[in-house]
Regions:
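Boundary detector for helix-to-coil junctions that initiate low-complexity/charged tails
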Residues: 1-14
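Secretory-pathway glycan-assembly enzymes, especially type II membrane glycosyltransferases
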Residues: 17-209, 213, 218-219, 223, ...
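Short, flexible/disordered intra-domain loops and linkers
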Residues: 51-52, 188-203, 255-277
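A donor-sugar binding/catalytic signature common to diverse glycosyltransferases
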Residues: 63, 280-322
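Conserved beta-strand termini and adjacent loop/short-helix elements that scaffold enzyme active sites
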Residues: 79-81, 227, 247-251, 316-319
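Short glycine-/acidic-enriched loop or helix-start segments at secondary-structure transitions
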Residues: 88, 235-237, 304-306
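Catalytic donor nucleotide-activated moiety binding site of glycosyltransferases and closely related
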Residues: 180-187, 216-271
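A short, acidic, amphipathic alpha-helical segment used as a generic capping/interface helix at domain edges
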Residues: 210-212, 276-282
Length: 323
């Protein structure tokens, strides 16, 4: 119990939250890439060593790294070219961060000048948390939401696509309950995969359905958006809620065929990787636009929470980590 209290206590103040991030980032290391004779700009290349992660795992890992770089007086440049994300491995010559996001300060890898830019590289760790879901201090939550809106911006083309998707899917004036389900995590846990170690346990589909029935009425919502990975979950929610159930139309697996672990790496190489991640981004963005939100803890839920302007009602199932 004392350990739990200590865990929650660290989120009470923005300053203590930031100090923890700084300590973790310091351990990640930083090394010099270019030292010009006459420096005009200080550039920090932000890199991740983790490769088997989704776009929103990058989002919540790079967010504190961007803030840390800016406070050091550096111009942050997110680099997903030097170490690629497996889920976008078909694009070896591209900085895949820029498929979906603008650079924080509008400076990219192609803009660097060896004659005048001092360049250092730092490595963002998966263990650096921006866990606003755990935060009980509203000022801290608003600080990071505003920071994220300023420095992690979707590209103009993607912003337009997301706005169109919202208009097409959400009826005007609808009060929407967002429900985030990640069946793949639970399949990993059942497989006892080493990849699942350190990941948060997820509420089952049945538990989320039960909660959604209760919260839809209790929180006065007239529509429900379900984001998920399997065909069975979509069918279950549509049978239960009928026309009130909304979802992004995208390719999904059956639960039995759902590839996880090593099979996921192989499967993703055969897909339209950019479209796969784009569909995921649409889902998480729409969750951020919901009236209320019901989820388990994962990087997509964290990102939706950060991108949102706040929810009338919010419930996250925190079931601990797989050790």
């Amino acid at each position: 119990m004392n350990r739990q209290l200590k865990t929650f206590a660290k989120y009470i103040l923005k300053s203590s939250f930031r100090r923890q991030i700084e300590d973790l980032l310091d351990r990640c290391g930083e090394h010099s890439v270019n030292v010009p004779a006459h420096r005009e700009r200080s550039i920090e290349l932000l890199t991740r060593q983790e490769t088997d992660v989704g776009v929103f795992s990058d989002y919540i890992a790079f967010l504190p790294a961007i803030e840390c770089a800016i406070r050091k007086g550096h111009i942050p440049v997110v680099d997903r070219k030097t170490i690629h994300n497996t889920f976008l491995s078909n694009y070896a010559d591209a900085n895949t961060w820029e498929f979906y996001f603008e650079q924080p300060c509008s400076v990219g890898l192609d803009d660097l000048n060896n004659d005048s830019d001092e360049v250092v590289r730092s490595y963002s760790s998966a263990n650096v948390p921006v866990s606003l879901i755990d935060c009980r201090d509203e000022a801290t939550v608003q600080y990071w939401r505003q920071f994220a809106r300023r420095y992690i911006r979707f590209t103009p083309e993607l912003r337009q696509q997301l706005a169109e998707t919202e208009r097409e899917l959400f009826p005007a004036g609808a009060r929407v309950l967002g429900v985030s389900i990640r069946e793949g995590y639970n399949k990993l846990f059942q497989m006892n995969s080493k990849i699942a170690v350190g990941h948060p346990f997820q509420a089952s589909t049945e538990e989320m359905l039960s909660q959604a029935k209760q919260r839809l009425e209790e929180w006065n919502c007239d529509r429900l958006l379900v984001t998920c990975q399997t065909e069975e979950t979509v069918e279950l929610f549509r049978r239960t809620f009928g026309e009130r159930c909304l979802c992004v139309e995208r390719p999904r697996y059956t639960y039995e065929a759902l590839p996880e672990g090593e099979r996921a790496r192989e499967a993703v190489r055969k897909t339209d990787q950019r479209q796969h991640e784009l569909d995921y981004i649409k889902e998480i963005y729409l969750l951020s636009r919901c009236t209320s939100f019901l989820c388990s803890k994962n990087s997509g839920s964290e990102a939706a929470f950060i991108m949102s302007e706040g929810y009338e009602h919010f419930q996250c199932f925190e079931l601990g980590l797989n050790r």
